[in-house]
Regions:
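Residue-level preference for alpha-helix termini and adjacent loops
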Residues: 43, 49-51, 112-114, 124-126
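Hydrophobic membrane-insertion alpha-helices, especially the h-region
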Residues: 15-32
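N-terminal Lys/Arg-rich, disordered targeting/topogenic segments
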Residues: 1-9
Length: 217
């Protein structure tokens, strides 16, 4: 009987299986590398030079976020507190606590404490803290319940898709401006978050940008 197919076709099924395995492995690697929480830094919790507890300072002592992050309402970036801010209290309070060694050394040398950054805006992206907090977006929406954290960690993925989801549905995060820094605020009066958010969205004529130029400048 005549052989209608060339000899190389005998290996065709094996080649197809090999290509499928390579493609499957590549797809698994891309998913693991780009879409897992580890890649997006979720849960990233570096050990800081000073073991600062937001739970103690905010929840237990009642300090306002703006005492330390004093530029958050007027600047695109929320500042890390200076050593002077820390020493306003700690010249008297817990002055001999060894956990404050890095603060004291900074105070004496004039060199800033080498705090480790937790939340990092992606490259080529623009984010303005003042615009958000002055239009009813609380710290909690991006940073989680920081007021209950002993050690700050990255709570959200902060990817482009995550940002766009909020820009498409801002009502899920809007709250009265007076409650932006009340990190334990919950809707009251029988209204849901969506009802309050939709009312504020209409009242303030909020229409967040969804085009590229909104965040990539």
């Amino acid at each position: 009987m005549a052989n209608f197919f060339p000899r190389w076709t005998n290996y065709l099924p094996l080649k197809i299986v090999f290509c499928l395995c390579v493609l499957g492995g590549a797809a698994s690697f891309v998913y693991w590398y780009y879409l897992t929480p580890e890649y997006m830094r979720m849960g990233y919790k570096p050990v800081q030079p000073v073991p600062f507890s937001h739970d103690i300072h905010v929840t237990q002592l009642g300090m306002d976020c703006r005492y330390c992050h004093s530029y958050v309402e007027v600047s695109s970036q929320s500042n890390i507190p200076t050593t002077q801010t820390c020493m306003n209290c700690h010249q008297q309070v817990q002055a001999s606590n060894p956990k404050l060694t890095a603060i004291k050394e900074s105070w004496e040398s004039g060199k800033p404490v080498n705090w480790l950054r937790v939340h990092q805006v992606p490259d080529f992206a623009y984010f303005n803290h003042a615009v958000h907090v002055n239009r009813g977006i609380s710290c909690v929406s991006c940073h989680g319940q920081v007021n209950h954290m002993d050690v700050v960690y990255q709570h959200e993925s902060q990817t482009m898709g995550w940002c766009l989801n909020c820009h498409r549905h801002p009502e899920n995060n809007l709250r009265p401006v007076s409650q932006v820094f009340n990190l334990d605020w919950k809707p009251d009066g029988g209204q849901s978050q969506q009802q309050i958010g939709l009312n504020l969205k209409q009242q303030w004529d909020i229409n967040p940008p969804q085009n590229c130029a909104g965040c990539h400048r």
